[in-house]
C-alpha cells in the first residue's frame, strides 16, 4: 500500500497493540494512528492516545468512558470517545482509516475484524477467532470487497512470506500451485517435557510462563495446551485454502524458525527470525516493502543448534481436538473456540484444574456433534452458536 496510512489499532493495550504502536512510531511520515480501542486499561489507553494523537478511542461501556475521561490530561482536547461493540465495528469500517490492526483477543474481536474486511481495508489479522469461528464468512468478505488480508500471527506471516503471493494479499480459493504442505512450528510451551500426570496441579502462573514470547495470559495458556497451535492450523486452512491433511505441526523449542512451506520438488522454505512480533507487524504494515522494525539481527552461530520434534498428542490433547474440529466443519470449530474460552477463563480464575481444559472442549465437541446441523451463513448465526456453546460449557459443572 503506497501513501500515508491511517491506522485503527483494535486491542491497542495488549502485547500486539504495544508492538504495533512501536513500529508505527518509527515511521511518522508513513503511518498515523486514527483510532485505538481497549477493554479495561483506560489509563494505558489514555496514555497511548496522548502519545499518538489518535482522533478516536473506542471503549466497551459508559463506565469505561468515564474512567478514560478521568485519566485524560486536562491540557489536551479529548479524542472522540465511542462506546460499545457496534461502535467498534463501525470504527473498523470508518472511512477515516485505511488499515485495521485486528488484535482483540477472543470472539469479541470477530465483528470488528469482519467489518474491516467487508469495507475493503488492509486488514492486519491477529485475531484468530475471525477465521476459526467464521472462516468462510470472513474470506468471502475479503474476496467481495477487495480487502487486503495480511496475517500477523508469526506462523502464518512466515508461511505468507514463503509462498509465491506476488504483490497482492487476498483470499485464495485454492492452494498455491506446487505447494505440498504447510508446516507450523510451536515452541511446545512451558510443559513440553511434562508427563500428563505432572500437569494435574499446574497453576495459572506456571501456564503463563512462556519460554520465548511475551503474550497475554489467555493466549499464554492456549500456548501451554497447544490449543493455540490448533487454532492456527484452522487459520492456515482458511488463509491458504489448504486441507487439514496438508498442514503439519512441529515442535521447535527455540522459536527461531517460525514456519515452513514444502514444495513438490522437495524444497522446503523456512522463515526465520527473532521471536519478536514487531517483525510480522512491520511486514504487514509495509507490504510489499520490508521495514526496519527495530528487531535485532538473528545470530545463528550464537544459537548453535535448532531442534524439532513431533508433538505428543497425549500431552497435548487440545491439538488433536483442533484437527478433529477442522475436519468436522465450521460448527465444530465454533464449539472448540467457545468452550476453550470458557475453560481457560475458569482455569485462570482458579475454578478449573488445568487438565480439565481439554475435557471441557471435548465435551462441547461431543455435544455439538449430537445436535442437528446448523447453517452458519451470517455473523449472527456464528454468534448465536457461540453463545449456546458457552452456556453449555459453563453449565457442565466443570467451568
UniProtKB/Swiss-Prot annotation:
GO BP, one annotated term: isopentenyl diphosphate biosynthetic process, methylerythritol 4-phosphate pathway involved in terpenoid biosynthetic process
Keyword Ribosomal protein (UniProt): no
Keyword entries, A-Z: Isoprene biosynthesis, Manganese, Metal-binding, NADP, Oxidoreductase
Domain of life: Bacteria
Catalyzed chemical reaction(s): 2-C-methyl-D-erythritol 4-phosphate + NADP(+) = 1-deoxy-D-xylulose 5-phosphate + NADPH + H(+)
Keyword Membrane on entry: no
Binding site for NADPH: 13-16, 127, 129, 216
Molecular-function GO term, any one: NADPH binding
Family recorded in the similarity comment: Belongs to the DXR family.
Purpose of the protein: Catalyzes the NADPH-dependent rearrangement and reduction of 1-deoxy-D-xylulose-5-phosphate (DXP) to 2-C-methyl-D-erythritol 4-phosphate (MEP).
Listed name of the protein: 1-deoxy-D-xylulose 5-phosphate reductoisomerase
Species per Swiss-Prot/TrEMBL record: Bordetella avium (strain 197N)
